[in-house]
Structure formats: C-alpha cells, structure tokens
C-alpha cells in the first residue's frame, strides 16, 4: 500500500490537476509518470456539450487514426460471395455466414471487430444478445454494416476507433500507445476531435468541445489545452 501511495505522491507533484497542458507537454508527462512494465495505451476523454438523454444528441461514430492505435486487430466478417472474397483479401481473419454464427453461439469469438454486409443481417440479427454486451454488434452508424466490407476491414486494421457518448456526455477512446511520438499522438488526437466536430448534433447549443483529458492505462488524467490544435 505504501508503494502505491508513494507513486501517487510523485505523480501529484508532477501534475497540476487544475492546469491545462499544451498537447506535447501532456504526452511527455504521460511518459514521465508511466512506471509499469508494459506499454500502456494512451486514452482520451472528451466532454461534449450535449444532453445524451435526448436521442437527437447521442454522438456516436468512428474515426480512422492516421497513425493507428498500436494494437493488432482481429476482424470477423459476415458476408458471402464476392463480398466474402473481398473481405478475405483485405485481411479479415474470419469470414462466414451461418457457420460463423454457429461459432459465435458456441462462444468462439477470437476477434475484436465484427463487420457485416447488409444482406447478412438476417443472420447477425440473431446474435444481438451475444455480440451486443461485448460491444461487437455491427452498426451502420459506425460503418460496421456496409456494402464495402473490404474498406471496413482495412479501416479496422489501420486503427479505426469507435466511440459513443456516455450518460455523462463524455466520449472515451484510445489514440495510441505511450511509445508513440508526441507528433503521432497529436495527429491522432486532431483526427478524433475533427471527426467529433463533424458529428456535432444540429440541436447542440453553446460550447461543444468542453474539455479534453488524456491518460495512460494506469495513469492519472491530464487536462489538455486543445486551442492550438488543427481542428
């Protein structure tokens, strides 16, 4: 317990919870306070000026980060015929229809993303209670139900992140790893915030991007001054 307390004291001495740090300085701080034996992810939280209790203010979507996330993504695709062939060529690990659905029902789900062609939804629709709770259910709003399954596979492999505003009006996602360069993390953050601005509900009034903070997997949140970003 004393060890944890000592670490937290060291972190508190380096990070001012009330300050908004320039982006590059924030990423440098993440590395300074990282003391675990694995390469941590860099997570971001964005507080939005929306009321998620209202259906027309629910912000959800996907963003393809220019420098990826640093994670290896395994993709499963529900498709048949030429679409199935295209998905395999694009790099999908698992492609199928009823046979893939049977594997899902058995609990064999060694994949991180599920993509479906529109004509496969009659099969995928039966798997909602299994895929839904795991955040794997395909949805056209985030591009995982699509005619162009090959592009969706490539996007997933390239570092696409999906997001949905929570009950507090906050988006949580990842933008890379602590061993990324600060420039790479900055570019990823800029792409995410740009896409979030594009997803702003028409009925949202006042300040939309209210607060941005970054953190490593095991680290504290660091408030970011995003006013000088190219968004």
From Swiss-Prot:
GO terms for cellular component: cytosolic large ribosomal subunit. GO terms for molecular function: rRNA binding; structural constituent of ribosome; tRNA binding. One of its GO terms (biological process) is regulation of translation. SUPFAM superfamilies: Ribosomal protein L1. CDD domains: Ribosomal_L1 (cd00403). Part of the 50S ribosomal subunit. Binds directly to 23S rRNA. The L1 stalk is quite mobile in the ribosome, and is involved in E site tRNA release. Protein L1 is also a translational repressor protein, it controls the translation of the L11 operon by binding to its mRNA. Belongs to the universal ribosomal protein uL1 family. This is Large ribosomal subunit protein uL1.
């Amino acid at each position: 317990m004393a060890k944890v307390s000592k670490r937290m004291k060291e972190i508190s001495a380096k990070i001012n919870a009330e300050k908004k740090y320039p982006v590059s300085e924030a990423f440098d701080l993440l590395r300074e306070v990282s003391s675990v034996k694995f390469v941590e992810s860099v997570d971001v939280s964005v507080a939005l000026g929306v009321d998620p209790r209202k259906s027309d203010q629910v912000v959800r979507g996907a963003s393809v980060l220019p420098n990826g996330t640093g994670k290896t993504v395994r993709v499963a695709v529900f498709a048949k015929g030429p679409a199935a062939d295209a998905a395999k060529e694009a790099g999908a690990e698992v492609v199928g229809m009823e046979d893939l659905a049977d594997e899902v029902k058995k609990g064999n789900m060694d994949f991180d993303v599920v993509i479906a062609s529109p004509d496969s939804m009659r099969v995928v629709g039966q798997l909602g209670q299994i895929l839904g709770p795991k955040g794997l259910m395909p949805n056209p709003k985030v591009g995982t139900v699509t005619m162009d399954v090959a592009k969706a596979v490539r996007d997933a492999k390239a570092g696409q992140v999906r997001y949905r505003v929570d009950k507090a009006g906050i988006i949580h996602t990842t933008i890379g790893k602590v061993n990324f360069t600060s420039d790479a993390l900055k570019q990823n953050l800029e792409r995410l915030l740009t896409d979030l601005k594009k997803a702003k509900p028409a009925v949202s009034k006042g300040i939309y991007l209210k607060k941005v903070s970054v953190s490593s997997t095991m680290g504290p949140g660091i408030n970011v001054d995003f006013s000088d970003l190219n968004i």
